[in-house]
């Protein structure tokens, strides 16, 4: 196999541009709220800038680490991440917000282990699929063990009230298994078996039912369950084609909840308009398309599965976030990669891009 020197510069550029633009949008979306809550309009800007710096350093390190090293660390990282997920439940260590226990409290920083768990899952599956790909046509020795492991992780995430992360991990794993050659009937059969459980989880939790009803008809409860999506629509509608101008949005002025986190695209749409949203969506599409090309041209199965999993993760999270913001899906609590405020998501996303970039230096041909 011929080795191609040099990183995929388009992947690198998209990650850097999206992150830098995200820092700007975090400031625009949060400055007024930060000034009122923390008496410092630059509070979230300074923190997000620090997260971006750490993320860029992590990406730079990952770019220069031979991705084959992750084979040795795939299982320890996977098990270690599971331990971190359990630490969330330990009093004094785990942090709770809005009824969800998802964070580990660190000095000056709350770490969300589910973000690391997504990448750890991809690394473990890439390692395992390379070794066991010939067994995937069999149910008990091939497909079922992955579902068993996934079931344990998903149970822990659901106990943390983090259905968004649980569904994301499940979707990424299923796509990776399908790409590796798992029979479609196994996947469809698992879906039919899991359907009653999913319905039970939704219909037995009042807050999840409110999300579903708000998704179907937000105007039925415009001041509570439907409030967030209605304010998001108002922001996007007000932005029109060209937007109100950077920093000129009104919905971020205590109307739109989570304006600098999960719904930052709404602020972007109001200030940069339809054009701005299309540009951001196009950048994500280009990032995912180039990442998949890196996966296809990878020199071995481990690199192929690793790059493909990262591409699917970033693309899926971006798609789901945009779908939620525009009302095409119920709210899930999934951040927009590179743009939403949050250290765990940004740092892990940039580091995963660094791993993917290292894969791009060892390909069978130019991507």
UniProtKB/Swiss-Prot annotation:
Cytoplasmic face residues: 1-8, 71-72, 160-161, 205-225, 288-304, 357-367
GO CC terms in record: cell division site; plasma membrane
Q: Name one GO molecular function term.
A: peptidoglycan glycosyltransferase activity
Q: What keywords appear on the UniProt entry?
A: Cell cycle, Cell division, Cell inner membrane, Cell membrane, Cell shape, Cell wall biogenesis/degradation, Glycosyltransferase, Membrane, Peptidoglycan synthesis, Transferase, Transmembrane, Transmembrane helix
The annotated pathway is: Cell wall biogenesis; peptidoglycan biosynthesis
Record field: catalytic activity? [GlcNAc-(1->4)-Mur2Ac(oyl-L-Ala-gamma-D-Glu-L-Lys-D-Ala-D-Ala)](n)-di-trans,octa-cis-undecaprenyl diphosphate + beta-D-GlcNAc-(1->4)-Mur2Ac(oyl-L-Ala-gamma-D-Glu-L-Lys-D-Ala-D-Ala)-di-trans,octa-cis-undecaprenyl diphosphate = [GlcNAc-(1->4)-Mur2Ac(oyl-L-Ala-gamma-D-Glu-L-Lys-D-Ala-D-Ala)](n+1)-di-trans,octa-cis-undecaprenyl diphosphate + di-trans,octa-cis-undecaprenyl diphosphate + H(+)
Residue ranges, Periplasmic compartment? 30-49, 94-138, 183, 247-266, 326-335
Secreted recorded as keyword: no
Q: What is the superkingdom listed in this entry's lineage?
A: Bacteria
Q: Which InterPro entries match?
A: Cell_cycle_FtsW-rel_CS, FtsW, FtsW/RodA
**Which Pfam family name is an example for this entry?**
FTSW_RODA_SPOVE
User: According to its record, how does it sit in the membrane?
Assistant: Multi-pass membrane protein
Q: Where are the transmembrane segments?
A: 9-29, 50-70, 73-93, 139-159, 162-182, 184-204, 226-246, 267-287, 305-325, 336-356
Q: Does the keyword Transmembrane helix apply?
A: yes
Location in the cell reads:
Cell inner membrane
The catalytic activity of this protein is classed by the Enzyme Commission as 2.4.99.28
Family of this protein: Belongs to the SEDS family. FtsW subfamily.
Q: According to its UniProt entry, what is the function of this protein?
A: Peptidoglycan polymerase that is essential for cell division.
What is this protein identified as? Probable peptidoglycan glycosyltransferase FtsW
